[in-house]
A protein has these predicted regions:
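Short, conserved catalytic-motif segment at the N-terminal edge
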Residues: 51, 56-75, 165-168
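GGW-centered surface loops in extracellular recognition modules
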Residues: 37-40, 44
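Functional-site microenvironments in short loops/helix caps that host divalent-cation chemistry
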Residues: 28-33, 46, 52, 56-57, ...
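C-terminal motif of bacterial Sec signal peptides marking the signal peptidase cleavage site
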Residues: 21-23
């Protein structure tokens, strides 16, 4: 099975086209604080706790990057009940006149600095503002290692036009915003007095009141379709939509977890503040619980060594057990900081200290 279908976004997709055309940080002691104010609208409180982060022993889908499981302690925090929606992001843009990465002119000189020396410049017709979208018209896949068969660089695709010119978010206020890069998410957080969750915080929230669960509802994989928006059928050519959705779903379309959080698994991937390092867990000192971990000190992905990646969590509507199986709490992948797509969004967190300012 291949587990890297979303590893590269714009940069990697363009690089593939070029080739085709040319032949613990844990510095602050945790107190698992319980001092809190009234929950902000649209957020819930996650109690500080010590829990097992990473792949559970019974998880047959677990990847090496999710191991070994290890004890971590996180302080309490607030987290959004849902992924940030189109309506919420629109309010931010209207208040700030912010322009997302997908809407900006592509800077080839900046991009070139992140590529192997000698990489030829793509044609100007390709270097246009846009984003990656899933190619729903893919009919056959010759080689599952070539993800460009089901991903398309769509000029004009962005958060306002998720499938390119002619598409719209009109009537979709309560759908998760997509085509947002890390920079876009951080700008929203600054405006809203929020921040992105750490990977440990994200897992603590996804676990809710459970302990050692693989999924947000427990360990029963047979009820996946009733609890998360994922791919059913044959990936990537046939989606039988047994869960009622072919692609992205409105937030709150599935049952919440035990503390009232929706869509922590499936629908869209969610950005975190942690840098992605494929061997991060293996490098940790696990003799005692790690206090408020903030992720790896540097980014490293052997399949994308030239760019910085952040951890994204939760999987998306494209996840299928034959390909990525990332509809699990411990699952994670890396995403480049300038990348967006039609299956990645984010949710935010806040601490009592942040809200008191």
């Amino acid at each position: 099975m291949l587990h890297h279908f979303k590893k590269y976004i714009l940069f990697s997709f363009l690089l593939s086209l070029i080739f085709l055309l040319y032949d613990c940080k844990s510095d602050t002691p945790a107190t698992t604080n319980t001092i809190k104010t009234e929950a902000p609208k649209g957020m819930v409180w996650v109690e500080g706790k010590t829990f097992l982060q990473g792949a559970k022993a019974s998880d047959k889908y677990a990847m090496p990057r999710e191991k070994p499981a290890h004890q971590v302690t996180v302080d309490g925090f607030y987290i959004d009940v849902t992924e940030v929606t189109n309506a919420q992001f629109k309010a931010f843009v209207e208040a700030t006149n912010y322009v997302t990465v997908a809407e900006r002119k592509i800077d080839w000189e900046k991009m070139k600095s992140q590529l192997p020396a000698g990489t030829p410049k793509p044609h100007d017709s390709i270097l246009q503002p846009g984003s990656l979208i899933f190619n729903k018209n893919v009919n056959a896949v010759v080689n599952m290692n070539n993800y460009t068969q089901w991903w398309t660089w769509k000029i004009g695709a962005n958060w306002r036009h998720p499938y390119g010119p002619g598409s719209s978010i009109e009537g979709k206020d309560n759908y998760p915003v997509v085509h947002v890069a890390l920079e876009d998410a951080l700008a929203y957080c600054k405006w809203a007095n929020r921040r992105l969750p750490t990977e440990a915080e994200w897992e603590a929230a996804a676990q809710g009141n459970q302990t050692d669960a693989i999924f947000t509802w427990g360990n029963d994989a047979t009820i996946l379709n009733a609890n998360a928006n994922t791919w059913q059928g044959v990936f990537p050519t046939k989606n039988e939509s047994k869960d009622g959705f072919e692609f992205i779903a409105e937030v709150k379309s599935y049952p919440p977890n035990s503390i009232g959080l929706y869509d922590m698994l499936g629908n869209v991937w969610e950005l975190t503040s942690d840098l992605f390092h494929v061997n991060y867990y293996k490098q940790l000192d696990t003799t005692s619980p790690i206090l408020n971990p903030k992720g790896a000190a540097k980014s490293y992905s052997p399949s994308n060594p030239y760019q910085v990646e952040h951890v994204m969590k939760g999987g998306s509507f494209l996840c299928h057990d034959s390909y990525c199986a990332s509809f699990r709490i411990s699952a994670k992948m890396g995403v480049t900081v300038d990348s967006g797509s039609d299956h990645m969004g984010f949710r935010t967190v806040a601490t009592p200290e942040m809200l008191s300012k």
